[in-house]
């Protein structure tokens, strides 16, 4: 007999979850967080979701009555739309920790996904109490349980206090049975068996498309009346929490359990024991080693890991007359009770049976009436209904343990007692095949009319299939004696039970039952089909990919062929860094980016069949470009004499070193034309989504921020191709930032070059303030949220001399004087609100169509998410550096002040933290990424980043960080960030000689006369265009002066060229001054709003084929662009005062455009057919948002 090998049958599912080490024992991949669940489950639609399935020949068609007496066969709170799937996962995952999601499409199991919440926290921990009259502490009680278990089972257990979780809200339960181990031992026993049962169902029966959940607990999970299902913990008729009630009210996906009762909505299915039994006794058709399985193939017998139990070995053929007239029971001490005393509410039916057997005497022939006993003690703590304290079995008061008996040995008795354990004893179906007369003990649960039921229980009839026994077993001896007195009747009952087994508990019957269940579920609800729209994450990804592809193909085409040697001018530094690297200015970076995009521009295949080959060629071309010997111009000159000579140099093979590598991703450092570039490549599906998102966000948002502030890294170019193995991959070329990570700096107590010695906390604040100000600026400019802002995603660059960085926020201009510049990297998980069509409203597609893009929390803009993240991890690093000793000395500036750290955390904590232990507990509560990104659900993160700085400076008077509010200084800003004209840089890159470099500068003013100047109709737009053109000309003129000085240009030519630039500036000044004068009496208004505003729907899981989205809400006009434009215009300064806004105009603008300047973020939601569609956030104002 073959024991099934999951790795062979389901190679893509039988893989470890590398994210969680304690999931190592799982045979099938088990999702440990919501992100993994969403990624692993299928969103595939069936080809015929409305197909009708015939039940002709199905023996369960007229027998299936899961909710006898109700109008419908199923609880009416169930639904089959996809929002119900989300609700049910939320309910099971967060409240009960475990479950399995099953999705069947086109008669195949496309998703079988176990899940178990890592970092689970319950809502009943405060109800777990020990008896203080017996035990000193909870640990003392657990020590007692451990010692008793060791004695009872003859084991040499050694109690270890650190293996008990000290936090009761981290325990989990199976109704009354409590698990408290630390760390929790995760497992997936019997999951493989259930996986195979569903595969066999789809292979041998026609079933509809459907989504379901399987309960992995013994106890059912969902009551029909909205009360807590775990009544032993909460008490009888205790209402569910408000969140659970809300989820249930919105609709639940069917939950399949192996046991239920009339008080529960769970739908019963055959147990894993049922399927394991028939697979080994009757055989199955799927996964048995045959290449093909069909209806005519013979079933083959298999077993399932980890036990690989073979039920076919048992021989139940002992004739009735030769069986012993004794009632037998063997089993563990499972169940909620802890005593054999039936006078107590805490009695345990199995302990009662064992005590009855222990005290009973044999008959006159020395044949016992009963042989019942416990074979293994389960002393796990119980929380029992109406009991205040946790309980466990006192083995000294119970009958002693007895030797086990195999099923075959038990079948030699005439009568067999079936007693519930935690719920119904799953062995009942096996016992019905043994030829014994079953004594079935009634369930002991709060209301005896609600007995535990399995999938076939409603077909069983007393004195036909079994002999009933009262729940307290008070008539057990009487019933055994009745059996002896009615031997023929009991023989008949045993034979009827066997017939029932052969008819209804066979392999064919199990599959018929499951088919009948699927079909009737599908027909029982008004929404009987699930048709997924395309996941907006992939819609977004395709939009971003198209944008990036167009940007690559629309890059400027130079005159010269590709193999022409290039001249990339050396970066004009924005500041001098301690080290070997230079950071290029905004203009240089823009031009360098254009150069790289042209180099790696993909070619469009003429034929579809050539796509793969073309992608391979692109990949080879990319590597060739990165690794070829680059031909560049070098300088060979005397002082003040620049003679450009062509020469060829080898850039060390271009490849410098590998920075990072795993199975699916690499990060390499390259040198391209003398500049360091980071090449990031990945073939992982989620990694590619994040790479595309990073490239898109950089191009539409981050790179533009570098005009003003230096706290972000530039992304130059993007490529999507196939690697050498034919696997699709994405490649990013990003700016290389030299320095150490913020995390390393903190751990080194900020002792890196240039930091103030002995003042680590002050130095941390200096960095944090810059990070927070840059995040605030990025949010205001383009709705940027990093979503993974940690100290290791920030590089600290230390400068030779201090610089002043200005952050022009909506609330004012903040200045920081510093030698330490934090640069934020890695935007794969980030979010922006941007338009892929450009920055300026020169076409109707720009303004009002700002859409939210992102991978994490796609449709949520959580303003303080990044601040919370960086503060949380920075505090953890600081506390870790300090070690376990608490810093008591107030003036000890060589250590991180822990009281200050705690105060930082109190900005977020809903309850005041006072001690190091409380601070660490708060940090570890959110430290895991899946908890971090959901933190907004439990704490207030709707504050703006700047509020943290205001909070911190108000309580930390002694920590003086040099920053303040002022008017924007354009001169200082220009010296830090603004140099060059990107078009001129690009032209210079492809210049063949110094003459062409020279021409690239002169083309800037000359091209001005060849173009049609924009002539907008509002004063706001006129000022914006004029300021931008003046800035472009003056920045290029500054760069030209540097070039002229280095190239020793003739003075006459130099002066003539300066005149050309000045004439162009005068031309722009005259032209726009007249245009502004024409509109001098006009009001200050924003341009006419675009009519074709979009509404982006969130993850569109919820549409069915018949569903149409009807909404009466009008699109919300986005005011982000206008707000930024107005503030930029107001903050504009010029050496000559050109186009500066006058004081009286400032007053008018602040009054007439107040609604724009005061616009805030706002959510909008739409509902259709009970399905919630989330509209993206945008800047709104009542005047423009209805």
Swiss-Prot record:
The organism's place on the tree of life at top rank: Viruses
Source taxonomy: Viruses, Varidnaviria, Bamfordvirae, Nucleocytoviricota, Megaviricetes
InterPro entries recorded: CAP10, Kinase-like_dom_sf, O-Glucosyltr/Glycosyltrsf_90, Tyr_kinase_AS
Protein name as catalogued: Uncharacterized protein 179R
GO MF annotation: an example: protein kinase activity
Gene3D superfamilies hit by this protein: Transferase(Phosphotransferase) domain 1
SMART domains in the cross-refs: CAP10
Organism: Invertebrate iridescent virus 6 (IIV-6)
